[in-house]
Amino acid sequence: MGSSMHVGVIGCSGRTGKVIVSALEQSSEYTLGPGFSRSSALTLFQVIAHNDVLVDFSHPLLTKEVVAHLLISPKPLIIGTTGFPGKCKEAHDSLEELTHIVPVVVCPNASLGAYIHKRLVMLLSQLCNPQFDIRIRETHHRYKKDSLSGTAQDLLDTIQQVKQEDWGEEYEVGQRDSSKKTIEVQSSRVGDIPGEHEVAFISSGEQILVRHTVFSRNVFGRGILSILDWLKTLNPQPGLYSLGDTLELVLRNEHCLLKKTTDH
């Protein structure tokens, strides 16, 4: 992929979509291509044809359509749409088919801090025994339609997987119940908060709390640029990738810069 990579944003009129569009407009590494929204003059096929990479932060039904179009005209895809592919078998199958053709990055939250937060939650899920109750609490702006957020759902899935693999315990979502292991999940939609996710591990005598708070939506734009850097630099093979796969490059680069600074 060349330095003049054209990037199209699906869902370009949404809150996150606008942030990504702004980040691309200010970038010297990438060219903002035509995007797609409800008011687009171009068809989805035309938008795909005019771009080298697609970034999708839209709606599960539209993302499903995007994947179907890309199976005909393959392009690398970054998906940040909440609830995709969800439990829809057809969406899962189409996405899997696309990953055999092009690299696809699925990232419910594109910020570096969210990735670090998730890693910490994974570690605590391994270390905290079943005597610790677990609570996930997420807060977003009043206009956010989805509840649970994609990031909170990803944290929930991560905790359930780790508890199953490391402790052999099945955790369900719900209020605390002595007869089964549960994870309490709370959602709040207030004000203009870009996003806050908090996971608590609570025993009878202590609490461990990890929280990630977004102060500016610009972090999502920077995160997408980091993923694009990864695509351009490594030119990965077709496959399904996570934000963690792409941010390892960013973390290594930052470590090298820090080492150079301290060496001087």
Curated annotation (Swiss-Prot):
Alphabetically ordered keywords of this record: Amino-acid biosynthesis, Cytoplasm, Diaminopimelate biosynthesis, Lysine biosynthesis, NAD, NADP, Oxidoreductase
Pathways per UniProt: Amino-acid biosynthesis; L-lysine biosynthesis via DAP pathway; (S)-tetrahydrodipicolinate from L-aspartate: step 4/4
Active site per the UniProt annotation: 140 (proton donor/acceptor), 144 (proton donor)
Enzyme Commission numbers on file: 1.17.1.8
Sequence similarity: Belongs to the DapB family.
Alphabetized Pfam families for the sequence: DapB_C (PF05173), DapB_N (PF01113)
Sample GO molecular function, one term: NAD binding
Binding residues annotated for NADP(+), in chain numbering: 38
Localization of this protein: Cytoplasm
Cysteine disulfide links: none
Any single GO CC term annotated in Swiss-Prot or TrEMBL for this entry: cytosol
Record: residues binding (S)-2,3,4,5-tetrahydrodipicolinate: 141, 150-151
Residues that hold NAD(+) according to the record: 11-16, 80-82
Gene3D superfamilies tied to this protein: Dihydrodipicolinate Reductase, domain 2, NAD(P)-binding Rossmann-like Domain
One of the GO biological process terms: lysine biosynthetic process via diaminopimelate
Top-tier EC class: oxidoreductase
Function in brief: Catalyzes the conversion of 4-hydroxy-tetrahydrodipicolinate (HTPA) to tetrahydrodipicolinate.
The name this protein goes by in its record: 4-hydroxy-tetrahydrodipicolinate reductase
Main location: cytoplasm
InterPro entries listed in its UniProt record: DapB_C, DapB_N, DapB_N_CS, DHDPR_bac, NAD(P)-bd_dom_sf
Catalyzed reaction equations: (S)-2,3,4,5-tetrahydrodipicolinate + NAD(+) + H2O = (2S,4S)-4-hydroxy-2,3,4,5-tetrahydrodipicolinate + NADH + H(+); (S)-2,3,4,5-tetrahydrodipicolinate + NADP(+) + H2O = (2S,4S)-4-hydroxy-2,3,4,5-tetrahydrodipicolinate + NADPH + H(+)
